[in-house]
Amino acid sequence: MTNRNDLKGAIMARTRITPLRLDGENAEQKREEIRRVFHETFSLYESLFDHLQDSAAWVEKAIPLRHPLIFYFGHTATFYVNKLQFAGLIEVRLDPHLESVFAVGVDEMSWDDLDETHYDWPTPEAVRLYRQEVRKMVDRLISELPLTLPITWDSPWWIILMGIEHENIHLETSSVLMRQLPLSRVSPVVAFAPWDQAGTAPQNALLPVPGGLVKLGKAKDDRQYGWDNEYGNHQHELQPFTAAKFLVSNQEFLAFVEDGGYHNPDWWDEEGDGWRRFSRAEHPPFWVPDVEGWRLRLIAAERPMPWNWPVEVNALEAAAFCRWKSTQTGENLRLPSEDEWRHLRNLSALSDSDGWEDKVPANIGLSAGCSPCPVDAFPQGDFYDLMGNVWEWTSTPIYPFPGFEVHPVYDDFTVPTFDQQHNLMKGGSFISLGNEMQQEARYAFRRHFF
């Protein structure tokens, strides 16, 4: 049997979990650092798809709102080609047909807007061969492109960093889709072994948080890669508030389920109730009812419910739980705003990844396993899991900061989400890498997505 520490070491040895800095004293060293991280990220993403057991797993839709996994396997490679050509860094496409098929996903859909289009998907082997060609092309560009430090967002190198961070995003979203496939379609992969400890959840409590001025927004000369929505300036004076010491655990959420929370429209707003009735949800998405008790679905296994792990729900479920919990406690409970989350993060004194040295202070970046872990495993100041474990929904729909500018190479990354339909998630998760784990990161999804 392989020792768990060996597994963790193998994961960390294979992958740089923190984002690349844009500055440095030696351009050639930076070139080789980028080459290494590109290949690590590209290979890690491919290894995630080793979970797929058979040819049917590649083309079966995990959920109706998303493409099958064969699309996402090709999509991240096609992204490099499309963006590099758009920026004028390559003249000839590698495979125009595949680059058309894999160009755009279906992530911006309402929960009842089902994609019924029939696609003639290529074979996994054909996509693997295509990915090999893309890997060679990007590696060649890394060798040939002139490099001046620091890298700025109008540098050709920004496109390569964009491709790396884009693949990090899809590593996470593809892993979620795999959790929604039938178990018969997937098998375990050692590099993605889950956390193996569970127990009774601690009693949650509200802790006082002092008010104060919170400032958000990156400067253009920031030394970490950022998506366009991170730049600009925002500040807000917060009044004192209280916040939960721990993330909501499966055990804490169970009371809502057992009290009929999924059957009582009183706890749901109009959007949430529409989703509840359409989806016919009766419990969190990865909970599996069993005659011997609840079980939890992971990527390639089910396990007895780890009650002290955080519950994984969408924003509509989280808001409904808060309304229900308010009546149980007499407190006015709700999701935090983006400003409040950032204020908590600031007060925790948690540094971004540059200050971590060899110790990762959270369940993030596959550093502790490929699953959530107990909600009391990683103290961060007075609170736990302000970073890592699972993403934290906020009540804030994403919006542009004053000074926001669209990045011309990826003009549809953020702007389509400025529709009041996409709420921000903060903090990253156990599988978040690179930019996703930074406190300035601003990722937003429709409120019914997991």
Regions found by a protein language model. Give the residues of each.
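Functional-site microenvironments in short loops/helix caps that host divalent-cation chemistry
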Residues: 163, 167, 177-226, 246, ...
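Intrinsically disordered, low-complexity peptide-like regions
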Residues: 1-4, 361
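Disulfide-stabilized, aromatic/cysteine-rich ligand-recognition loop
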Residues: 3-66, 74-79, 86-147, 153-182, ...
